[in-house]
UniProtKB/Swiss-Prot annotation:
It is found in: Membrane. GO terms for cellular component: membrane. Belongs to the ammonia transporter channel (TC 1.A.11.2) family. GO terms for molecular function: ammonium channel activity. The chain crosses the membrane at residues 50-70, 85-105, 131-151, 156-176, 202-222, 246-266, 284-306, 314-334, 336-356, 369-389, 422-442. This is Putative ammonium transporter 1 member 5. Gene3D superfamilies: Ammonium transporter AmtB like domains. It is a multi-pass membrane protein. Its main location: membrane. Involved in ammonium transport. The keyword Phosphoprotein applies. Pfam families: Ammonium_transp. It comes from Arabidopsis thaliana (Mouse-ear cress). The keyword Glycoprotein does not apply.
């Protein structure tokens, strides 16, 4: 702990006079005991802070569940809710058995961790159980992103397989590259950093959001669009989610959890900086919460007015997605940029999301939650944003002062950090495409990926989960007249 009390008998003997050695030893011993108690208290506070942050990030699973449920049609609600529970449960076991070791196992090489499988020889000198729990919450967030892209048409066994593979292997390898002190592109390396700086992805615009988004992109591409989304290869038909209320609820829960996702990624709070006695990591944590807030708010408002110009109406679900896109983008640089730069981040993130959605329609790509566009597209912009706007002072505070460490291009730091960020984008796209793309392709060839046309028309709840989620639910247009749909049609809800 910094600021520790130092004491020696030799220092006190001259002041206490003859026969003072024993007294000096006693006094120094007492001061040492007090110093140890302060150190223990600091560890306890840091671990409590990290545990609280882990609880917030885990609460995001409820946000994902509500967002997904509201974004699909009523006949598929039970299925999508079950997949969110599955992400957490299967992810917990596979991250415990393999994922944490691949990501942070000590010691390791630059590509993958090789120790601490099943948390053997744990805790270590640098990591406690609170750190494992926090990282598990991140891993299942990536899997939750993917489930939204392939909603309403995917076999349950495919969810089991992809979720376990993603949280147990694909995601941990990426997190090792950029977050482990041994990772080949990590800014935490003591030497031989990528382009002299390492790729800065503080809380996971690339590691979490791009990984989940690119995995979902391949799943949705290989499966193909839902029945009725692009009838006869023509214009897109909106297959609206059944509950804007659940979408808004999920969005606010995710917003709340993001205050553990981004500020919590400091992992410690009681670290003073050298800039002043009242300025330390606690200040950086507060600034990170502010930049997170401003980026999301700016993206929400930009989406509100941008979609109003394009569609002619105010759409709450579009605004919610814009808000989340702003959060996904700022996640990489939230700790190393000024608040004004976060506004720029959110503004551009909204435009990226709108543009990606337009491109998806042109390419006949169907993603019920816009997960690939939101998390993949906005996550990639977030990495580029760091290479442009990262501030030298904040980088040295967060990642440790290092002579010649590079910072944002627009802040006068040259282009090497931007180069490292572009490398991160390329390798994440390549790695996830090679692993998850191959997995989804194999599942399709084995007829384990997509449900039958009849089950898709009737709804996955009735076909595979014992019945509908609601006693009174809206029969979707494409289920009318299909045998086995016994629930009478209810009035359609008002347009959002």
């Amino acid at each position: 702990m910094s600021g520790a009390i130092t004491c020696s008998a030799a220092d006190l003997s001259a002041l206490l006079g003859p026969n003072a050695t024993a007294a000096a030893d006693y006094i120094c011993g007492q001061l040492g005991s007090v110093n140890n108690k302060f150190t223990d208290a600091a560890y306890a506070i840091d671990n409590t802070y990290l545990l609280f942050s882990a609880y917030l990030v885990f609460a995001m699973q409820l946000g994902f569940a509500m967002l997904c449920a509201g974004s699909v049609r009523a006949k598929n609600t039970m299925n999508i809710m079950l997949t969110n529970v599955l992400d957490a449960a299967a992810g917990g076991l596979f991250y415990y058995l393999f994922g944490y070791a691949f990501a942070f196992g000590e010691s390791s090489d630059g590509f993958i961790g090789r120790h601490n499988f099943g948390l053997q020889n744990f805790p270590t000198l640098t990591s406690d159980y609170s750190f494992f729990l926090y990282q598990w919450a991140f891993a299942i967030a990536a899997a939750g992103i993917t489930s939204g892209s392939i909603a309403e048409r995917t076999k349950f066994v495919a969810y089991l397989i992809y979720s376990s593979f993603l949280t147990g292997f694909v995601y941990p390898v990426v997190s090792h590259w950029f977050w482990s002190p041994d990772g080949w592109a990590s800014p935490f390396r003591s030497e031989d950093r990528l382009f002299g700086t390492g790729a800065i992805d503080f809380a996971g615009s690339g590691v979490v959001h791009m990984v989940g988004g690119i995995a979902g992109l391949w799943g949705a591409l290989i499966e193909g669009p839902r029945i009725g989304r692009f009838p006869d290869g023509g214009h897109a038909i909106a297959l609206r989610g059944h509950s804007a209320s659940l979408v808004v609820l999920g969005t606010f829960l995710l917003w709340f959890g993001w205050y553990g996702f981004n500020p919590g990624s400091f992992t410690k709070i009681l670290i003073p900086y050298n800039s002043g006695s009242n300025y330390g990591q606690w200040s950086g944590i507060g600034r990170t919460a502010v930049t997170t807030t401003l980026s999301g708010c700016t993206a929400a408002l930009t989406t509100l007015f941008g979609k109003r110009l394009l569609s002619g109406h105010w759409n709450v679900t579009d605004v919610c997605n814009g808000l989340l896109g702003g959060f996904a983008a700022i996640t990489a640089g939230c700790s190393v940029v000024d608040p004004w730069a976060a506004i720029v981040c959110g503004f551009v993130a909204s435009l990226v999301l709108i543009g990606c959605n337009k491109l998806a329609e042109l390419l006949k790509y169907d993603d019920p939650l816009e997960a690939a566009q939101l998390h993949g597209g906005c996550g990639a912009w977030g990495l580029i944003f760091v290479g442009l706007f990262a501030k030298e002072k904040y980088i040295n505070e967060v990642y440790g002062a290092s002579p010649g460490r590079h910072y944002g291009l627009f802040m006068g730091g040259g282009g090497k950090l931007l180069g490292a960020q572009l490398v991160q984008i390329i390798v994440i796209v390549g790695w996830v495409s090679a692993t998850m793309g191959t997995l989804f392709f194999i599942l399709k060839k084995l007829n384990l990926l997509r449900i039958s046309e009849q089950h898709e028309m009737r709804g996955m709840d009735l076909a595979g989960h014992g019945g509908f989620a609601y006693i009174y639910h809206d029969n979707d247009d494409d289920s009318i007249g299909v045998p086995g749909s016994p629930v009478p049609r209810a009035p359609n809800p008002p347009a959002v």
